[in-house]
Amino acid sequence: MQEAIKPPVEVQYKEELEVLKNTDTGRCPQNWQMSPKAVRTFILGSSQPISYQGKEYQIQKKYFGNDALIERCIVTLAGNRGLMLVGEPGTAKTMLSELLSAAISGVSTNTIQGTAGTTEDMIKYSWNYALLLAKGPSREAMVPSPLYVGMEKGILTRFEEITRTPAEIQDSLI
């Protein structure tokens, strides 16, 4: 099996996520796997170790910046609203979106990569034309996009480089 250059956040921090999920006593918003407080702890770390199954676990700090920004992101997502991270290159937008997705949905890889060539089909769904011809329009012939998968499963969809997409794509999402 090939090893990934950079494993997904949910693989890289699997143990921390498991500890937080299983020790979390807070209320989880719908489709969240842990409470907003546990999501904050996952990203900003814990000052005290967490006891789980007879062991002590220290949740490491993953984001070094403005803690209030993390809290605003979590509150926005808990309010069932979209979140757009905007900033200069290298300001940890992708890293933060991966951490939030892994903590909230358990998956950080449900992603659309925006380019100048991104079309509406790429953000909704497309068709497996061989199956479409053989069986007609059916769920089996449909190839869902990450956005479709996110809506179907109730998980976050990350949209990288949305500003590179054509204006009509941006307008349809915003």
Name what the model sees in each region.
Residues 2-174:
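AAA+ P-loop NTPase catalytic core and its hallmark functional loops
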